[in-house]
């Protein structure tokens, strides 16, 4: 789950954009010669910004962050692919559901977390840009 800036063009979608390491050795970029990267999303709430449920079909470094930034909708608070926001000291991204098979009992385990209260505030409040010197 993530809060992205602005309103997405569609209530659900699939971002299929290959990623590779940028020349700076830190950032990832969308590039035709990159590794396959596919992200599905579904809008959960939309106001000034958008709360999205995200499903990764691949697992590339920074995949969610780069894919939404490439659409022009970076994650709120993302200092690498968007801009810092004084309201949140990290990017607005949280795993809300985790499924796995217990290796001992072989039972399917599901753990879920609620939407952080801060995420709902980020939907409507104006961004507070951190001053730079």
What are these regions (language model features)?
Residues 1-133:
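RNA pseudouridine synthases
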